[in-house]
Amino acid sequence: MSRSRINGNFIDKTFSIVANILLRIIPTTSGEKEAFTYYRDGMSAQSEGNYAEALQNYYEAMRLEIDPYDRSYILYNIGLIHTSNGEHTKALEYYFRALERNPFLPQAFNNMAVICHYRGEQAIRQGDSEIAEAWFDQAAEYWKQAIALTPGNYIEAHNWLKITRRFE
């Protein structure tokens, strides 16, 4: 049984109904429909915290999906799971791969910045201010890109850039 059929969440059910209607009326190939079904089931599993199941669905969606734009969102969601699991190196890899296919994902830039900022904080706790500054500088670059794509968003990041004199 498709995961979306067993999910009890109202929003997920609504999304599934709308997605199923769209799949019927929009001309798509069977492969595209199957890829979307895996993607939808991956999102459902991810929203419930079932990351292993979500990853399986996303990997299947990646195998079937050919559109670079759609692939970027699959890769982004895989990055989110790795971030949630504390696998920051893997997460950064998937965010990079998502941005290669779709450079207009401010949320990927933001998440990369958050990881870099976190690593900077870790370096400070370990007494390595030089490494910390390098991580903070990288975080600043990613936040600048996120802010450039969506002015008015990421207010806390914008304030951090101003306070740390990294905003030009």
Swiss-Prot record:
<dbReference type="GO" id="GO:0015979">
    <property type="term" value="P:photosynthesis"/>
</dbReference>
<keyword id="KW-0802">TPR repeat</keyword>
<dbReference type="InterPro" id="IPR011990">
    <property type="entry name" value="TPR-like_helical_dom_sf"/>
</dbReference>
<comment type="similarity">
    <text>Belongs to the Ycf3 family.</text>
</comment>
<keyword id="KW-0472">Membrane</keyword>
<comment type="function">
    <text>Essential for the assembly of the photosystem I (PSI) complex. May act as a chaperone-like factor to guide the assembly of the PSI subunits.</text>
</comment>
<dbReference type="InterPro" id="IPR019734">
    <property type="entry name" value="TPR_rpt"/>
</dbReference>
<keyword id="KW-0602">Photosynthesis</keyword>
<keyword id="KW-0793">Thylakoid</keyword>
<keyword id="KW-0934">Plastid</keyword>
<feature type="repeat" description="TPR 1">
    <location>
        <begin position="35"/>
        <end position="68"/>
    </location>
</feature>
<dbReference type="InterPro" id="IPR022818">
    <property type="entry name" value="PSI_Ycf3_assembly"/>
</dbReference>
<feature type="repeat" description="TPR 2">
    <location>
        <begin position="72"/>
        <end position="105"/>
    </location>
</feature>
<dbReference type="InterPro" id="IPR051685">
    <property type="entry name" value="Ycf3/AcsC/BcsC/TPR_MFPF"/>
</dbReference>
<keyword id="KW-0150">Chloroplast</keyword>
<dbReference type="Pfam" id="PF00515">
    <property type="entry name" value="TPR_1"/>
</dbReference>
<protein>
    <recommendedName>
        <fullName>Photosystem I assembly protein Ycf3</fullName>
    </recommendedName>
</protein>
<feature type="repeat" description="TPR 3">
    <location>
        <begin position="120"/>
        <end position="153"/>
    </location>
</feature>
<keyword id="KW-0677">Repeat</keyword>
<dbReference type="GO" id="GO:0009535">
    <property type="term" value="C:chloroplast thylakoid membrane"/>
</dbReference>
